[in-house]
């Protein structure tokens, strides 16, 4: 197909994200036409801007942890990922459940990341 082994791109992206391996993560995302849509309707366009955003967000919080609960490959180019991000708020580990929609371009690289926050039941 393209430049990458499609079957493992999403899994490698998540593994690199969890350990803050930005060079490894960069190898899983498209150089062109990358768009990240956040849970608050925020949009980041471009590979370098997205990597800069991740470096700032993921490296800062105390006690940061990413746990992947389920990966569902809807097609050869679309994947849903249920995960949780945990970091300390006032010294207390706080978990934030999310769902990501990841889309891959014809070369197998991730070119679209959409982030949805799950609502915690009261």
Give, region by region, the residue ranges found by the protein language model.
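Short, low-complexity N-terminal intrinsically disordered segments enriched in polar/charged residues
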Residues: 1-28, 32, 122
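A solvent-exposed, acidic/Ser-Thr-rich amphipathic alpha-helical stretch
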Residues: 23-27, 31-71
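A beta-strand edge to alpha-helix "cap/lid" segment located at domain peripheries
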Residues: 2-5, 51-122
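Generic alpha-helical hydrophobic packing signal
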Residues: 10-11, 23-26, 43, 49, ...
């Amino acid at each position: 197909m393209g430049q990458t082994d499609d079957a493992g791109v999403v899994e490698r992206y998540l593994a690199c994200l969890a350990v803050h391996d930005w060079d490894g993560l960069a190898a899983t995302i498209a150089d062109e036409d990358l768009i990240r849509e956040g849970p608050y309707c925020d949009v980041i366009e471009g590979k370098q801007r997205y990597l800069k955003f991740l470096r700032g967000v993921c490296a800062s919080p105390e006690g940061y942890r990413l746990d992947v609960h389920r990966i569902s490959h809807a097609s050869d180019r679309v994947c849903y990922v249920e995960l949780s991000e945990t970091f300390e708020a006032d010294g207390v580990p706080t978990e934030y459940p999310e769902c990501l929609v990841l889309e891959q371009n014809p070369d197998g690289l991730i070119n679209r990341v959409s982030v949805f926050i799950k609502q915690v039941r009261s």
